[in-house]
Amino acid sequence: MHAQFRMPVMPDAAGLAIAEAEEVVRRAAEREEARARRKARNADRQRCRQEERGRNGADQRERQRAEQERLREEAEKARAVLAERAAELREKCGGSVPGCFAAVPDPRGRRGRRHSLPSVLTLVLMAVLRGRTTLAGITAWIAHAGQDLLAAAGARTGAGGRRQPPSGRTVTRLLGMVGARALAEAVACYLAAGQDPEPPAYPLAGPALQPHLACDGKEARGAVRPDGTSLFLLSAATGGIVVADREIPAKTNEIPEIGPMLLELNDRFPLAGWVLTADALHTQRGFAALACENLGAHYVLTVKGNQPGLHAALAGLCWAGARRHRTRDKGHGRRETRSHLVMDAPGEIKALFPHAAQVARVIRTRTVTSWKSNGKKRTRVTETSTETVYLVTSLTAREAGPEHIAAYIRGHWSVENEVHYVRDVTLREDASKIRAGSRPRALATLRNLTAGLIRQSGHDDIAATIRDTEYDNDLLYALLRITPDL
């Protein structure tokens, strides 16, 4: 017998439709439930973020209040320490330039001294103040100096009561023997005491300019050490006056020398609250830590290729919302526009560089107009160049705005005109061929002292003042802060 064949039972259309509808409803309910759970999680996260921001904001306000109190206390301490140290320096230096030189140890033995070291150095400085730039010119001027000038310098009294100038050989020998570093420290100490800087005011009312110290190195091209290497000096200047300098050894550079120089300067007057600027060579984590942690100061530093990671991070930032400041200069056939964009340092920059609070981008556009001739006619030529520079600073937006950052940048580059140009051109340092012993460094120090004395006396034109001293003894005495016996 054949097995009985049965047809499979097929669900009816109505049952399928109901099942599909139930599945759709179930899935929709699951999606709605998942959406509700996500919404609840997002709400919880948002609430947590708000609570965290509130706690962070309260913590930040508390930290700001503590920082304000700390800075206020430091400013009060700085005022007291500054007044005390200024009084000590004035007492030590005697108030006059010969008193400053009296603090320099005499390298000669006690026997056979005919001319005191302060009198010889004062006469050399007089010659420099009267425009003598070579060793031959200095010794010739001293040999023919009048009795009143010799007496004012403290030269020895010879037979018949006449003042005797030191010989050219004595002057040359002493300049080669004197401790160049001791002389530089005494001069820097004296200029720092005369500068009498005010302690920085804490900018409670808003951003404001603070005292500025520019650090920059210079090669004395004409001066050569006994080993044949050039003389390099690292200087710290404020207001065109060198208040600290340090010789760079032949087998190193400025980086390991700037820290000891600033620490020594800090012993003369506190640098807390000052703004330190330096070129891109010193854009180092160690320098930033030294400025902010050891000195209590701030920094404004240029970022270039020696910090590739930091430079790339700054170049990759979005500057659309940055605060802006623009300056324009015109003169000598040149127009220069500088656009400064400043904003708070993001977290990635703070992770790369210590104490970074703000970052800046400066776009310099320079247009130079000149005339060129082909022998028949002159043609006016205009050339335009653009340069982009990045900077990092420890100054917060509360302490410095874009206009203040711009002022610190310009103030740093003014060292070229106020210090280096004066020494190179007016005092002819690059043309000097003095090479033996400590003479190059000693005369470089006396050139710094010359410019510093003139500026501290209220004269801005160094060259004109030097010309005037040639015919005005009273002006010379005033610059040296001495009162001659009449």
Task: Please annotate each region the language model reported.
Residues 259-304:
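Domain-level cores of phosphate- or acyl-group-handling catalytic modules
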Residues 224-273:
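Electropositive, glycine- and tryptophan-enriched low-complexity nucleic-acid-binding patches
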Residues 224-227, 286-290, 311-315:
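Short acidic, glycine/serine/threonine-rich loops at helix termini
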Residues 123, 138, 167, 213-218, ...:
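Short, conserved catalytic/metal-binding motifs centered on acidic residues
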